[in-house]
Amino acid sequence: MNYIKKILALLMLSSSLSLIAQDMVVYNTTAGNLSSVIPADELKELREVKLTGTVNAADFFFIRDNIKEAKTIDMSEVQIEACEVSGVSYAANEIPANAFYEPYASTGLSRLSTFYFPLSVESIGENALYQSIILRTTNLAELPVLRIIKAGAMSRCTRLREVELPASLEEIGAAAFAHNSQLSDVTIAPESQLRLLGKNAFNGCIKLSSLDFSATQLEEVGEQAFNACSILNSVLLPASVKYIGEEAFMYTSVNQIDWSHLVGLRVVEGSMFYGVGTLNSVILPHSVEQIKASAFALCSGLSTISLPYHLVAIGDWAFANCTSLRTIVCPTPIVPQVGYLAFQGVNTSAVEVQVLESVLPLYENDADWGYFRLKGDAFTGISVGEHQDLQVCRRYGNVEIVSPIAIKSVAIYAYNGTMLRQERIDNMQAIIELSATEHCIVSIAFVDGNIRVVKL
């Protein structure tokens, strides 16, 4: 009797192993012919599929519309050829737009948990894997020539927990990983070529706590890139960043910002840190000229901020309801213009503002700054990259400048901080016509990101 039971058990095990072995079905195809390769009666039964050979956009759409029960699709060994479908051209080596997402039905491949991209893929098209709601595993890290992940390509993949981006990647499109509610780990390969992070790229990734872009060549961070990443407390950016869009860090949990190395950044855009109650300390690069509306509004934990040396204007409501603010370091040689209700809800009499001793009287007589506790400081330790052999002189109603390196721009201010004019320069010598004002301050921005201010 025991012998018979053992035989039956072995037969059952053999049958199970046979079924497992048959789960992964391999089809070799040529571009545009997948529909004729897979028998119609097998389509609904396919769970594990591997393709070899060549495919095109038509084959992706065939999979989307007919192999809806697939859990694993392995296309790592296929080549994608260019084609035209319904009058739309699709490029070679690109996962086509809406590859596995049906826009009219607003559904993706709802059972797809593992997808292996072709190793030759260079671009992942818009909404390619949008709303693949149980997708967990991909081979993104193994794609040696991937350059672009386009808008919405892997958005609302609500089971995706980890993403590893290859070094070849140059651009992450708008909302490419937005609203991936389980995404907690994003790894970027060393020596990354990443230059552009599109708007809303990681918007709503509520389990993402940190991001490190410091090893990339990132230049631009789009609007709302990290908006509503509610536990995101650390984002490291490289010195190459020149632009960060509005609301980029809105409703995150960032606690400290030190952007002193971002020498190409000129503007802190509107509502950039709006509602970030955890933010307590901010250091901005001296290259910043403007802080726009509501940039730090409702940052209730912000206690200290170091303003840039070259700051000209603070926008409306920029620091509204920063109720913990106690120290502002403001080493500018001019008095920055303050917008409407810029410090609304701030107890200005409790805030110490450290300013240059030479311009302290201007702050004391200013309608906006006069309400703060003002303190003169020599700022002897501040470094703004002065070029010692710079020659600036006033002659014949002009300001004449001779520089050791190329100049990016020159701004002329009156002593009260009013900008008289600004000129864009692209050489090492400049003559700027001067208005009738008796005295002026010349602010020179160099192409290397340094700044020099000269009082005449």
Name these PLM-found stretches.
Residues 439-456:
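C-terminal tail/sorting-segment detector
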Residues 376-396, 404, 450-451:
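Residue-level detector of functionally pivotal "anchor" positions at catalytic/ligand-binding pockets or at interdomain
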